[in-house]
């Protein structure tokens, strides 16, 4: 056998040991394992929502809840959320305001 061919044969047979493919796979499996462990420790969360309607321009959510949407009387579509828990209808004449309030349970 020629020396070049012999060297090539040795190099090809050692190639799987040189390539760090196993190191990458073990790192990925370690990361996957850690993610699965973290997810298994979490408790499932549910969302709990309710609507609050009041007369006037303001509708406030109960303690611990945040506004996720507002509705206003007289077809008013102009509103904003104040302090994260109160709907404020911005039209000049307003008979009612409603807030959709939610929390994670």
UniProtKB/Swiss-Prot annotation:
Signal peptide: 1-23
Keyword Disulfide bond assigned: yes
Keyword set, alphabetical order: Disulfide bond, Hormone, Secreted, Signal
A GO BP entry: response to bacterium
Induction (free text): Up-regulated in colon in response to a high-fat diet. Also up-regulated in obese mice mutant for the leptin receptor LEPR (db/db genotype).
General function of this protein: Probable hormone.
UniProt-recorded name of the protein: Resistin-like beta
Source species of the chain: Mus musculus
């Amino acid at each position: 056998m020629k020396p070049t061919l012999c060297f090539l044969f040795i190099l090809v047979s050692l190639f799987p040991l040189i390539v760090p493919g196993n190191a990458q796979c073990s790192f990925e499996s370690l990361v996957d394992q850690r993610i699965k462990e973290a997810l298994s420790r979490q408790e499932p969360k549910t969302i709990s929502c309710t609507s609050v309607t009041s007369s006037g321009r303001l509708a406030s959510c109960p303690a611990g809840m945040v506004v996720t949407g507002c509705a206003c009387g007289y077809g008013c579509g102009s509103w904003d959320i104040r302090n994260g828990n109160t709907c404020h209808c911005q039209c000049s004449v307003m008979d009612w305001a409603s807030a959709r309030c939610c929390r994670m349970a």
